[in-house]
Amino acid sequence: MTAIRPGSVTFENVTKKFGNFTALPNLSLTVEPGTLVTLLGPSGCGKTTTLRLLAGLEHPTSGRILIGGKDVTNLPANERDVSMVFQSYALFPHMTSLENVAYGLESSGFKKNEARERAEEGLKLVGLGGMGHRLPAELSGGQQQRVAVARALVLEPQVLLLDEPLSTLDARLRRRVRTEIRELQQRLGFTAVYVTHDQDEALAVSDTIIVMKEGGIAQKGSPRDLYEAPASAFIADFMGEANVVPCEVISAENGEAVIRVAGLTHRVPARNAQPGPAQLAIRPNAVTLQPQAGGGFSGTVAHSAYLGDHIEYEIETEHGKLFIVDPAVEQSLPLQTDVSIQFKTRGLAIINQ
């Protein structure tokens, strides 16, 4: 393999319709060379359609798609200089790992010996050197996933596309393989567009996350930006769960805001807060509970569940039920206990109305 040639991706006012249904209305986005960008969102948000348009498996109704600055809008998939890792890996069960990786090269016109050499190099890149003789059934799920990545990378694409590549793995293996994907992308420096509905997965692997909703971009930013500074209640809840309650921003200056919630004032990071009515997003682990209700923000324990290293509570308040995660497992609160709710310094975000 020669050096990786990471390419950029640009969507310019792309619309995709299926009959009378508009899946993507006027979508514009960019992916910088050498970065891993995740398209994240619930089912039906348009992320898979976006990936298929980029791959050339679908064509836009209007707008332009560019890869590495080249207009590929009307090019077929085999002329786009992208490779895809499918959800199912799509490995041939009767072929060895080496033969699977070499298959795309041979189909692209490489001679068998050269294809084999490149395939061996590709397997080494993903940590499977010396395992080319094994059939897919003789590999773990994570190893099969790496074979699929190697098969895509040996074609030296400008952009690697990953369509929910970890969805068939169990939870423990997903954590390990997502770390391997991120390490490989950073080490080799290829451009990757990654589709998932799993928020933890997106936070772990991405340089940039694009959260999609109803065919559009709800918010784009770094994992930390989206988690700590959500632009809407939808983003706050989608990126790791949040309790959203009404508040009033009294003042915001020098990076700090003074807010009023349930008659009490609190100081939180201001970010882009503006004085006036707003919403406060509260992460489940951003509060402490005290077993006595006084003035201010208080509630009653409506439900609890012991989960080993923490307890999950539902607290009934005047603003509805709050979902709380409490690490103090030795001090579980009985049902119907009246509690006061106190905010920690982190895990709070103001959402402007």
Curated annotation (Swiss-Prot):
Membrane topology, as annotated, equals: Peripheral membrane protein
Its Enzyme Commission number(s) read: 7.2.2.7
Q: Which PANTHER family match?
A: SPERMIDINE/PUTRESCINE IMPORT ATP-BINDING PROTEIN POTA (PTHR42781), THIAMINE IMPORT ATP-BINDING PROTEIN THIQ (PTHR42781:SF1)
What name appears for this protein in its UniProt entry? Fe(3+) ions import ATP-binding protein FbpC
Outline the extent of the ABC transporter domain.
9-239
Which reaction equation describes what this protein catalyses? Fe(3+)(out) + ATP + H2O = Fe(3+)(in) + ADP + phosphate + H(+)
Organism (species): Brucella abortus (strain 2308)
Presence of the UniProt keyword Ion transport in the record: yes
Q: Name one Pfam family in it.
A: ABC_tran
Claim: Membrane is one of the keywords in the record:
yes
What do we know about how this protein assembles, alone or with others? Answer: The complex is composed of two ATP-binding proteins (FbpC), two transmembrane proteins (FbpB) and a solute-binding protein (FbpA).
Functional summary from the UniProt entry:
Part of the ABC transporter complex FbpABC involved in Fe(3+) ions import. Responsible for energy coupling to the transport system.
Top-rank taxon of the source lineage equals Bacteria
User: Where does the record say this protein resides?
Assistant: Cell inner membrane
Q: Which SUPFAM superfamilies match?
A: MOP-like, P-loop containing nucleoside triphosphate hydrolases
Q: Which InterPro entries match?
A: AAA+_ATPase, ABC_SmlMolc_Importer, ABC_transporter-like_ATP-bd, ABC_transporter-like_CS, Mo/tungstate-bd_C_term_dom, P-loop_NTPase, Transp-assoc_OB_typ2
